[in-house]
Amino acid sequence: MTTDTIVAQATAPGRGGVGIIRISGDKATDVAMAVLGHLPKPRYADYCDFKNASGQVIDQGIALFFKGPNSFTGEDVLELQGHGGQIVLDMLIKRVLEVEGIRIAKPGEFSEQAFMNDKLDLTQAEAIADLIDATSEQAAKSALQSLQGEFSKEVHELVDQVTHLRLYVEAAIDFPDEEVDFLSDGKIANALYKIIDKLSAVQASAKQGSIIREGMKVVIAGRPNAGKSSLLNALAGKESAIVTEIAGTTRDVLREHIHLDGMPLHIIDTAGLRDTTDTVEQIGIERAWNEINSADRVLFMVDGTTTDAVDPHDIWPDFINRLPANLGVTVVRNKADLTGENLAMTEEKGYSVYRISAKTGLGVEELKQHLKSLMGYKSNLEGGFIARRRHLEALDVAASHLQLGKEQLEIYLAGELLAEELRMAQLALSEITGRFTSDDLLGKIFSSFCIGK
């Protein structure tokens, strides 16, 4: 861990009402004496002059001193809050750098110091960046939940439960009770099942939190002239795609990024899927399948005037059979204004079926509500946390090891192998909060922060 004293502008570059310079480290007191002529009383606002080396006043403003470890970084911290002109702030930083042992902070280094000094865990540190980068009110609320430790609490509880069970298994192996077969008495199995259930619940919440942060990717797919581009326009609320009666008008991927009541949604319109000898259209269809394979959800667009079927396996079995196994599909029967179909949503063999008219807007609002529900709109209003892709990956790894441990217990009664799977699950979960995390990962995470944070 670095012992350098660092300085950076904590407010956005440019012109503003207030500009803040932040200093953290052992030399913060030296900076105070050099620039202010005195050390402010800790945690009190001190209005004073900010002076250069010749004693001339650079600016006037508020100085705040926080004595470590009772500060954001856990070190001595000095904040100089002056006027928000960039020239003035640059002069002030230049003056601070004249004090021996001070350097410019790297992106995210203040938060990194807070993490290294146990003021924050890694999920809380990441939540700071997510709160700053939030693109919707819901994302900001969820990031704040993570910053306040909601996600960390869930992960710590899982780590504690896995660790406790692992220690119990290892102790039972080392000190066996000859009268009781601890692997088959049900206690370990019950404890393991409870952990797996809790992890599954956390995974579901984290997936919703990831959607809040990164958005849900929804691909509109189907045969040519089914109304895919019209639906894109209806969902986006503007004419993003060209719509004609000519089949195959859309030949490339079109993207729109919208928010549904604060929930980010990435809508992808694709070329109509069919056999064709047209080289350009073939490229568009190949790109369409690439988008489908990486989607969170597919809206299977069906021209309602061509078939009465509602089961996608009856409508186009080859298309459904080619989709990734775990990809969710919503069937959208279009042109209800022509077919006269009831707009009510129905469930058909596990698939949600919506009847709409993308041209007139009939049923589109109900489809939007469906997409909001898929993104966990209600649960996130009630207070969900935000999550990143690396969190989901770590949870998946932990779940995989717990399932392998379950097999070792149920099939082979292999205590040593169960203990090893529990250890691996513990390590995967601990990576989320940063207890066991490589320096490379830490560098990647904090380098994405803004300077001064």
Curated annotation (Swiss-Prot):
Name the cofactor(s) required for activity, per the record. Answer: K(+)
Domain TrmE-type G: from-to ranges: 215-376
Q: Which GO terms describe its cellular component?
A: cytosol
Biological processes, Gene Ontology terms: tRNA methylation; tRNA wobble uridine modification
PROSITE patterns per UniProt: G_TRME (PS51709)
The UniProt record gives the binding positions of Mg(2+) as: 229, 250
Query: What's its EC?
Result: 3.6.-.-
Q: Write down the InterPro entries for this protein, in alphabetical order.
A: G_TrmE, GTP-bd, GTP-bd_TrmE_N, GTPase_MnmE, MnmE_dom2, MnmE_helical, P-loop_NTPase, Small_GTP-bd
| SUPFAM superfamilies reported for this sequence | P-loop containing nucleoside triphosphate hydrolases (SSF52540), TrmE connector domain (SSF116878)
* Entries under Gene3D superfamilies matching the protein: P-loop containing nucleotide triphosphate hydrolases (3.40.50.300), Probable tRNA modification gtpase trme, domain 1 (3.30.1360.120), tRNA modification GTPase MnmE domain 2 (1.20.120.430)
Query: Is the keyword Ligase assigned to this protein?
Result: no
- Annotated residues that bind (6S)-5-formyl-5,6,7,8-tetrahydrofolate are located at 22, 79, 119, 453
Localization in the cell? Cytoplasm
**Record note on cofactor:** Binds 1 potassium ion per subunit.
- Any one Pfam family match given in the protein's UniProt record, by short name: TrmE_N
Provide any one GO MF term from the record. Answer: metal ion binding
Binding locations of K(+): 225, 244, 246, 249
Q: Does the keyword Protease apply?
A: no
Q: Which major enzyme category is it? A: hydrolase
| Keyword terms of this UniProt record | Cytoplasm, GTP-binding, Hydrolase, Magnesium, Metal-binding, Nucleotide-binding, Potassium, tRNA processing
Q: Which HAMAP family match?
A: GTPase_MnmE (MF_00379)
Function of the protein: Exhibits a very high intrinsic GTPase hydrolysis rate. Involved in the addition of a carboxymethylaminomethyl (cmnm) group at the wobble position (U34) of certain tRNAs, forming tRNA-cmnm(5)s(2)U34.
Self-association and partners: Homodimer. Heterotetramer of two MnmE and two MnmG subunits.
Please give the family membership noted in the entry: Belongs to the TRAFAC class TrmE-Era-EngA-EngB-Septin-like GTPase superfamily. TrmE GTPase family.
Query: What name is this protein filed under?
Result: tRNA modification GTPase MnmE
**Native organism:** Shewanella sp. (strain ANA-3)
